[in-house]
């Protein structure tokens, strides 16, 4: 009776099913838990069955999970009512695991004017350190007493090295505080993490902002 709904949920809500297995099925989600899928919906007992492969034992395991209390009046005799209950369970399970309902499986590179200006600003100290005429060329465009004083102060290997180190440490701290938690929250696959971290070291907060923007474009991922 629910075959088409089961197929739809398995196709589009793998993360939600995994969350339900962890939160409502009380199964720890480790690397050994693979291929979580919905196999049955039983409205008579108000349960659904999840099946998954446990690679350490090599066994396919079934877990029967009760639907949460239907306190919103959803009719479990209809596909619409079942979808609404699943949506609620997906949201609750994701919140309990402190994860997003959606997954970001791409790398968003800097493309806005602000992003590009930040990259230019990051590149200037190393450029001036390696090629000192670049420093003088920059301040040639600002011929005033303040510019001359600042140029004289920056015209030092020690000062430029300190700026480069401070820049790196600041961005590393921003990456640790803002980017890393979002990579976990948005379930970014491991193969994309190194690029996101590298962008964090280059830009600081920028990648965190792009992760949030990408998440907003993906929406919540309800059962349709």
UniProtKB/Swiss-Prot annotation:
Disulfide bonds: none annotated. Keywords: Endoplasmic reticulum, Glycoprotein. It is found in: Endoplasmic reticulum. It comes from the Eukaryota. The keyword Lipoprotein does not apply. Glycans are attached at residues 10, 70, 74. GO terms for cellular component: endoplasmic reticulum. PANTHER family: MEMBRANE PROTEIN, PUTATIVE (AFU_ORTHOLOGUE AFUA_1G04315)-RELATED. Present with 2120 molecules/cell in log phase SD medium. This is Uncharacterized protein YDR476C.
């Amino acid at each position: 009776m629910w075959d088409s709904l089961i197929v739809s949920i398995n196709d589009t809500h793998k993360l939600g099913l995994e969350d339900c297995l962890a939160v409502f099925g009380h199964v720890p989600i480790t690397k050994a838990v693979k291929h979580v899928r919905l196999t049955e919906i039983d409205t008579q007992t108000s349960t659904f069955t999840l099946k998954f492969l446990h690679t350490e034992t090599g066994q396919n395991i079934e877990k029967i999970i009760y639907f949460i209390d239907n306190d919103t009046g959803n009719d479990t005799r209809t596909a619409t009512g079942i979808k609404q209950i699943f949506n609620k369970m997906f949201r609750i399970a994701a919140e309990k695991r402190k994860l997003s309902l959606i997954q970001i499986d791409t790398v968003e590179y800097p493309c806005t004017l602000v992003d590009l200006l930040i990259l230019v600003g990051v590149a200037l100290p190393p450029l001036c350190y390696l090629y000192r005429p670049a420093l003088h060329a920059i301040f040639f465009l600002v011929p005033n007493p303040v510019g001359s004083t600042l140029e004289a102060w920056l015209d030092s290997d020690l000062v430029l090295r300190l700026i480069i180190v401070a820049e790196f440490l600041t961005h590393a701290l921003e990456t640790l505080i803002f980017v890393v938690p979002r990579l976990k929250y948005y379930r970014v696959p491991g193969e994309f993490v190194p690029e996101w971290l590298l962008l964090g070291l280059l830009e600081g907060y920028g990648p965190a902002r792009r992760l949030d923007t990408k998440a907003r474009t993906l929406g919540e991922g309800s059962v349709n």
